[in-house]
Amino acid sequence: MVRAWYMDDSDADQRAPHMTDPPQPVELDQLKNIGVLYWQLSGNEDDETLAGIRKDRGYSYNDLIEITPEKLPNYEQKIKTFFEEHLHLDEEIRYCVGGSGYFDVRDKGDKWIRIEMEKGDLIVLPAGIYHRFTLDEKNYIKAMRLFVGEPVWTPYNRPADDKDARKEYLKTMGLAA
């Protein structure tokens, strides 16, 4: 089951949990309130529930990515890119089939929430939400990336408030100017 919490302000290793003291857990309904969707699945690539979700949501393309120094070309550069705060014009859909890592997302007050991803976790980040990704201290994740149609993974680093996806996200969240 996914765990999420508000992050501390430490500049220590990005792969550390970064929990506040005392911890401030974030519940699934709080994630849903900022547009983040979550499912707990088996962790198998051929999960039947995943097949149903893919059909219902139109996820017609998928691939697998292994993020580890031994398997990912240009590892150091990729890790820096993933951890740069950004948004996408489409949903970001990830299903963890091995290992673990963290997605950090901004809440409505612009505070960081850290979402721990482990085997079996399926997460959907809405288009226009500022976020970033990092491995945890185990330095390994294997994830299925899902897309509607042809894969597009174009990050727009913050600030990207001029993008229509960001404006629509803010409007949906009741935060439009």
UniProtKB/Swiss-Prot annotation:
<dbReference type="GO" id="GO:0019509">
    <property type="term" value="P:L-methionine salvage from methylthioadenosine"/>
</dbReference>
<feature type="region of interest" description="Disordered">
    <location>
        <begin position="1"/>
        <end position="23"/>
    </location>
</feature>
<dbReference type="Pfam" id="PF03079">
    <property type="entry name" value="ARD"/>
</dbReference>
<keyword id="KW-0963">Cytoplasm</keyword>
<keyword id="KW-0028">Amino-acid biosynthesis</keyword>
<dbReference type="GO" id="GO:0005737">
    <property type="term" value="C:cytoplasm"/>
</dbReference>
<keyword id="KW-0486">Methionine biosynthesis</keyword>
<protein>
    <recommendedName>
        <fullName>Acireductone dioxygenase</fullName>
        <ecNumber>1.13.11.54</ecNumber>
        <ecNumber>1.13.11.53</ecNumber>
    </recommendedName>
</protein>
<dbReference type="GO" id="GO:0005506">
    <property type="term" value="F:iron ion binding"/>
</dbReference>
<keyword id="KW-0223">Dioxygenase</keyword>
<dbReference type="GO" id="GO:0006555">
    <property type="term" value="P:methionine metabolic process"/>
</dbReference>
<feature type="binding site">
    <location>
        <position position="86"/>
    </location>
    <ligand>
        <name>Fe(2+)</name>
    </ligand>
</feature>
<feature type="binding site">
    <location>
        <position position="131"/>
    </location>
    <ligand>
        <name>Fe(2+)</name>
    </ligand>
</feature>
<comment type="similarity">
    <text>Belongs to the acireductone dioxygenase (ARD) family.</text>
</comment>
<dbReference type="InterPro" id="IPR004313">
    <property type="entry name" value="ARD"/>
</dbReference>
<feature type="binding site">
    <location>
        <position position="88"/>
    </location>
    <ligand>
        <name>Ni(2+)</name>
    </ligand>
</feature>
<feature type="binding site">
    <location>
        <position position="92"/>
    </location>
    <ligand>
        <name>Ni(2+)</name>
    </ligand>
</feature>
<keyword id="KW-0539">Nucleus</keyword>
<dbReference type="InterPro" id="IPR014710">
    <property type="entry name" value="RmlC-like_jellyroll"/>
</dbReference>
<feature type="binding site">
    <location>
        <position position="92"/>
    </location>
    <ligand>
        <name>Fe(2+)</name>
    </ligand>
</feature>
<keyword id="KW-0560">Oxidoreductase</keyword>
<feature type="binding site">
    <location>
        <position position="86"/>
    </location>
    <ligand>
        <name>Ni(2+)</name>
    </ligand>
</feature>
<feature type="binding site">
    <location>
        <position position="88"/>
    </location>
    <ligand>
        <name>Fe(2+)</name>
    </ligand>
</feature>
<dbReference type="GO" id="GO:0010308">
    <property type="term" value="F:acireductone dioxygenase (Ni2+-requiring) activity"/>
</dbReference>
<dbReference type="InterPro" id="IPR027496">
    <property type="entry name" value="ARD_euk"/>
</dbReference>
<feature type="binding site">
    <location>
        <position position="131"/>
    </location>
    <ligand>
        <name>Ni(2+)</name>
    </ligand>
</feature>
<comment type="pathway">
    <text>Amino-acid biosynthesis; L-methionine biosynthesis via salvage pathway; L-methionine from S-methyl-5-thio-alpha-D-ribose 1-phosphate: step 5/6.</text>
</comment>
<dbReference type="GO" id="GO:0016151">
    <property type="term" value="F:nickel cation binding"/>
</dbReference>
<keyword id="KW-0533">Nickel</keyword>
<comment type="function">
    <text>Catalyzes 2 different reactions between oxygen and the acireductone 1,2-dihydroxy-3-keto-5-methylthiopentene (DHK-MTPene) depending upon the metal bound in the active site. Fe-containing acireductone dioxygenase (Fe-ARD) produces formate and 2-keto-4-methylthiobutyrate (KMTB), the alpha-ketoacid precursor of methionine in the methionine recycle pathway. Ni-containing acireductone dioxygenase (Ni-ARD) produces methylthiopropionate, carbon monoxide and formate, and does not lie on the methionine recycle pathway.</text>
</comment>
<dbReference type="GO" id="GO:0005634">
    <property type="term" value="C:nucleus"/>
</dbReference>
<keyword id="KW-0408">Iron</keyword>
<keyword id="KW-0479">Metal-binding</keyword>
<dbReference type="InterPro" id="IPR011051">
    <property type="entry name" value="RmlC_Cupin_sf"/>
</dbReference>
<dbReference type="GO" id="GO:0010309">
    <property type="term" value="F:acireductone dioxygenase [iron(II)-requiring] activity"/>
</dbReference>
